[in-house]
Amino acid sequence: MLRGIDHIVIVVNDLEIAIADYGALGFTVVRGGRHPGLGTHNALIAFADGAYLELIAFIPPVAPTPHWWHSTLADGGGLADFCAVSDDMDAEVEAFRHAGAAIGAPFEMSRERPDGYRLVWTLAVTEDARRGITPFFIRDHTPRDERVPRDERVPRARTHRNGAAGARVLALAIGETEFDAARRIYEVALGRTGETVERADLGGAGVRFMIGPHELQLLAPTDPAGAIARRLRTRGGSPIELTLRTAGGWRGMLDAAGTHGARIVMA
């Protein structure tokens, strides 16, 4: 059973600058470490609801090996992917495969934190054009509490000056020709029908699903001049907007320059 969003991936060009900029926006940013063999390093923004944002960048010099994040960076960076947390990763992977998602074979990854602690987990990711539309899945081999910053290890790691308390809504931009297939994947895998949702502010409409405490919105364009249509023209189907839950803090859309291209709303 899916229990919610584990984390949301935000791809940035320069991790050090992103850490400073997100800190200036009122987030507590914790350095995550390096991913051996992948050529990336990250920093994390953890929330009280257990979800977190992963700021991730290629370590200079960027290797010429093709990676789908390069197109995201070429379009300014920002929201790129998301991971779902599950009671049983193997069962969820099979359910999504049965529904039509092209999820590849699980593989092991690791990250070495700045304090030397080595985190190990298994990932299963989508391998076709729906990557970023269907989630990837994770199974921890080391404790999740070591992977995700917590107050016991980093003082006030999950407390933010801007009042951010957790993920609320992740909106996904999906092309008209792909929308029905994407909706079917979720409906079959989750065993329920999505509820109709309209997002005039993004120029889209579609369906929404509750995944634990988090809402996923699958949106197709309704306005050729809207944000969803523009996103589809520049980078295809992908996460387009994240709404964060706040606890009495600042409300509204964060400056896109400070978020390195990620459309983030505080509500």
Model-derived regions: residue spans:
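Glyoxalase I/VOC metalloenzyme domain signal
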Residues: 1-5, 11-30, 47-267
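Short, solvent-exposed beta-strand-to-loop segments that form ligand-recognition rims
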Residues: 34
